[in-house]
Regions:
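Short recognition helix of helix-turn-helix/winged-helix DNA-binding domains
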Residues: 1-61
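Winged helix-turn-helix DNA-binding recognition segment
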Residues: 42-104
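Short, amphipathic alpha-helical interaction segments positioned at domain boundaries
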Residues: 106-113
Length: 113
């Protein structure tokens, strides 16, 4: 991989969004990267539910491949995000991936420290 210095005119490569609030949360770095990936997927290819709220379907195996992590690690990180109130998983039928709603922190100081 080659690297170059940034200038004022440098065009950034594709990036994933990560709210700065996330940096202070007591969750693993894997969960933080997963949140950024889920938020990116929601913005890029989210599906609207009947209320107009965006969600994604991201099977565990695909999420594990996208993050280069094991399925066990992905499940643990999803639970971390759910416990922190950052995602909501809605279970579907047998063999169908869950709907994952990515929730946004309301403001910079919203989370317990």
């Amino acid at each position: 991989m080659e690297f170059e210095f940034m200038t004022a005119d440098t065009v950034l490569p594709p990036c994933m969004p990560l709210p700065t609030t996330m940096l202070r949360l007591p969750i693993s770095n894997t969960a933080k990267v997963m949140y950024a990936r889920l938020l990116d997927a929601t913005l890029a290819e989210g599906t609207e539910d009947t209320n107009g709220i965006l969600f994604v379907r991201f099977p565990i195996v695909e999420l594990a491949a996208a993050l280069s992590r094991s399925s066990v690690t992905v499940k643990r990180s999803l639970k971390e995000l759910e416990d922190a109130g950052l995602i909501l998983r809605v279970r579907r039928g047998v063999g169908e991936p869950n709907r994952i709603y990515t929730l946004l922190p309301k403001k910079e100081g919203c989370c317990d420290e």
